[in-house]
Amino acid sequence: AESNVAVSLASFGDEAAFVTKLPENPVGEAALNELRRYGVDTSLVLKGGPRLGIYYFEKGTNIRPTNVVYDRAGSSISLADSSEFDWEKLLSGIDIFYFSGVTPAISDSIAKAVEEALVYCQAHHIQVVCDLNYRSKMWSHEKAQSVMKKLMHYVDLCIANDEDFESTLGIHAYDGDVAHGIDQIDSYRQGMQEIQRQYPNCKAVASVLRNVTTVE
C-alpha cells in the first residue's frame, strides 16, 4: 500500500519518498528501479537482509473472489530491527507520513519502528495518515487491535472501510458488508464518528463506498 501511495503522489507531481529495507541484490535493485521509474525517491531505503518479501495474486472471476498468498517470512524488512531506522534523519523535511496496517503486521519489530516514527512525527508536527488496511492472512483481529489501537493515538487522518472498523479497532458500527457500501452510507458515517470519538486526535476519517456485483 505504501509504495502504491508513493507512486500515485509522484505521478501527480508531489515529492514522495519510500522507506523500507530491501536485500542488496539484483532483485532488491529491480524493485527500487521500478519505484524510481515513477519518480519516487528511494534514497532512504535501507539495504541488507536475505530476500525480498513477495505475494502471489490469484485473480478472481465472476463471484469467485481474488486470493492472495503471502511469502514474507525471512524477508529483509521482516527481520529488520527497529533501531535500524533513524527517524530523525528519515523524516527530515517531511510534511506528511503515511503508513498502512500492513506494515506493523509484518513483525513486532517493525510495529515498534512504526510507533517510534509516529512518536517523532507528533513531536515535530508531521501529519500522520493511516490506512487501516486489515489483512486477515497477516495477523488476527486480537493482534491487530492490540497494535493499531495504540498507533491510532498518533493518527491525524484515518482511512478505513467497514471490515477495518471492527477487525482493527473493535468498532461495530455498521450493518451488512463492504460489497454494499453505497447502500449503507449512514452506517459508515457512524463508524467514522466513533473513530473520532475514541481518538480525538484524528481530525478526519475517509472511506471508499461501493456496491460490488463482480470482481472483474
Regions found by a protein language model. Give the residues of each.
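Alpha-helix C-terminal capping segments
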Residues: 4-15
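Anion (oxyanion) recognition and catalysis
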Residues: 10, 36, 115, 119-123, ...
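Conserved N-terminal subdomain of the carbohydrate kinase-like
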Residues: 15-101
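Hydrophobic beta-strand scaffold residues
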Residues: 16, 42, 128-129, 159
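Active-site beta-loop-alpha junctions enriched in small/polar residues
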Residues: 73, 102, 133-137, 163, ...
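A short helix->loop->beta-strand "cap" motif at the edges of active sites that frequently abuts
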Residues: 120-127, 199-203
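Conserved phosphate/ATP/ADP-binding segment of small-molecule kinases
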Residues: 138-216
